Design a protein with these regions (language model features):
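Short, well-ordered secondary-structure micro-motifs
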Residues: 22, 47, 75-77, 98-101, ...
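Class I SAM-dependent methyltransferase SAM-binding "motif I" and its flanking Rossmann-like core
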Residues: 47, 51-109
Length: 188
């Protein structure tokens, strides 16, 4: 079986512009089964694989989701936060000011609705995201980090923002989180 890497049409520049969903799905037209895997989540959920799935539907192919681990749901299950009411936000803004504003907005929504807010971040920005949470959220708000979920190096920790501040007083202190797939969960 041949494996191909897909990062989405906008993200595939390093592989050339010739890689399009229809090109990768040609084996379907030939009657072959295909599968879609994600690095640390669920294909098609906050994942460029959604483009491939939509293209498969447009081709008339049968699309069948398979049971498997979802870092988003695993994080929620292990967080101890509200699992009855939750919202997945995908990726938050990269810009420092926009990210801080979004975090404060999510905290307000979480408090108002008693709803767990869930998001993910590109692993190389984990420390910046954690520091943004520590520096902008209320001390009593609860934050869970689900790091390397389902791997031997897994770490799942839920603490108040005040306790996160004590554990990681600066960005250098949280360097061990950098470049590790992480799910962030917030309950205000």
């Amino acid at each position: 079986m041949q494996m191909s890497e897909w990062r989405g049409a906008a993200r595939n520049a390093k592989y050339g512009d010739s890689v399009k969903p229809a090109d990768l799905l040609k084996p379907l037209l030939a009657g072959n089964d295909m599968g879609l895997m994600s690095e640390a989540g669920v294909p098609g959920v906050a994942d460029p694989g959604a483009e491939l799935v939509l293209a498969a539907h447009k081709m008339g192919a049968q699309v069948k989701p398979l049971v498997g681990p979802s870092s988003i749901l695993l994080g929620l299950m292990a967080s101890g936060l509200n699992g009855q009411r939750f919202a997945f936000q995908g990726y938050l803004p990269h810009d420092t000011h926009e990210r801080t504003a979004k975090l404060k907005q999510l905290e307000i929504e979480s408090r108002k609705l008693q709803q767990t807010q869930i998001w993910i971040e590109t692993p190389y920005r984990n420390t910046a995201m954690l520091m943004a949470c520590i520096n902008s959220l209320a001390p009593q708000s609860l934050l869970c980090l689900g790091v390397d979920l389902s791997l031997p190096s897994e770490m799942i920790t839920t603490l108040s923002i005040a306790d996160w501040r004590k554990r990681y007083p600066n960005e250098a202190a949280c360097a061990s989180l950098q470049n590790r797939p992480t799910v962030f969960l917030l309950l205000a």
